[in-house]
From Swiss-Prot:
Pathway: Cofactor metabolism; pyridoxal 5'-phosphate salvage; pyridoxal 5'-phosphate from pyridoxal: step 1/1. Homodimer. The lineage of its organism: Bacteria, Pseudomonadati, Pseudomonadota, Gammaproteobacteria, Pasteurellales. Signal peptide: none annotated. InterPro entries: PM/HMP-P_kinase-1, PyrdxlKinase, Pyridoxal_kinase_PdxY, Ribokinase-like. Transmembrane segments: none annotated. Its EC number is 2.7.1.35. It holds the Pfam family Phos_pyr_kin. Its cofactor is Mg(2+). This is Pyridoxal kinase PdxY.
Length: 286
């Protein structure tokens, strides 16, 4: 069994961060060591919440604790998502290096959550800069959305072709694999949900339905990053992992849309996470 150290947010109510990613990864047969960067009552897009940001020292101390009982070498991957403070970025990078020293084959997937004030996604000052200047260079895989793609590449990215160029730029900055979780308004079709996956071997594009919500569910990117990493650890090829992830997330979104509920319906869609009924295919475009 593969093991993922998942360092991201926790919400008591609803689905975001580790709450959105842990159960789906476990469904795929991967053990998840969840380390929470924050503990909030609910995700920040409600506009109000209670809770705490975990002290930055907690990350290193918890890693040390796992190491001291001789289990850290069993960690196959580190996944980072929503980060509670700029100082935590450094701690997460250090944690990955510690894991890597115990298991040289371990990989790091960075989901570079930078915040989106227009949508109510709020992150602490300095987190964006830390992700760009520190985490990206150490990540084997990075999973930006459109906002994060612009920040990581330093390009404006106003159309499909510029998105391709931005992905190519990121591949020169450290990551070996880039999964763009949502092309948003720079996609080819306004009525579709479109994604990219890129390596040195090329760029693949996948398109699936875009569901309409009164309020967009939160935690979709966390679910996407977790499923992609779990699929890779389970031995799927890059493209198999990309397709399974896109299809499983599509099915979760369809179930959620049909439910009329704001929060992701991960439990209700559990069978489709394991075996997606959707069968959208990735097409190589570069």
């Amino acid at each position: 069994m593969k093991n993922i150290l998942s360092i991201q947010s926790h919400v008591v109510y609803g689905y975001a961060g580790n709450k959105s990613a842990t159960f789906p990864m476990q469904l795929l047969g991967v053990d998840v060591w969840a380390l929470n960067t924050v503990q909030f009552s609910n995700h920040t897009q409600y506009g109000k919440w209670k809770g705490i940001v975990m002290p930055k020292e907690q990350i290193g101390e918890i890693i040390q604790g796992i190491d001291e009982i001789g289990e850290l070498a069993k960690c196959d991957a580190v996944l980072s998502g929503y980060i509670g403070s700029a100082e935590q970025v450094t701690e997460i990078v250090n944690a990955f290096h510690t894991v890597k020293s115990r298991n040289p084959n371990a990989i790091y997937l960075c989901d570079p959550v930078m915040g989106h004030p227009d949508k109510g996604c709020i992150v602490a000052d300095g987190v964006k800069e830390g992700l760009i200047k520190q985490a990206m260079a150490h990540a084997d895989i990075i999973t930006p959305n459109l906002v994060e793609l612009r920040e990581l590449s330093g390009l404006s990215v106003e159309n499909f072709e510029q998105a391709i160029e931005a992905v190519k730029v990121i591949l020169t900055k450290g990551p070996k694999k880039v999964l763009v979780k949502h092309l948003s308004k720079v996609g080819k079709q306004a009525d579709k949900f479109e994604m990219f996956f890129a390596t040195e071997e090329g760029i693949w594009h996948i398109s699936r339905p875009l569901y309409q919500f009164d309020k967009e569910p939160v935690g979709v990117g966390d679910l996407t990053a977790g499923l992609f990493l779990a699929n890779l650890l389970n031995g799927k090829s890059d493209i198999e992992a990309f397709e399974h992830t896109a299809n499983a997330v599509n099915d979760v979104m369809e179930v959620t849309a049909n439910s009329g509920v704001y929060e992701l319906q991960i439990i209700a869609a559990r069978e489709f996470i394991l075996t997606p009924r959707s069968q959208y295919k990735a097409i190589k475009i570069v």
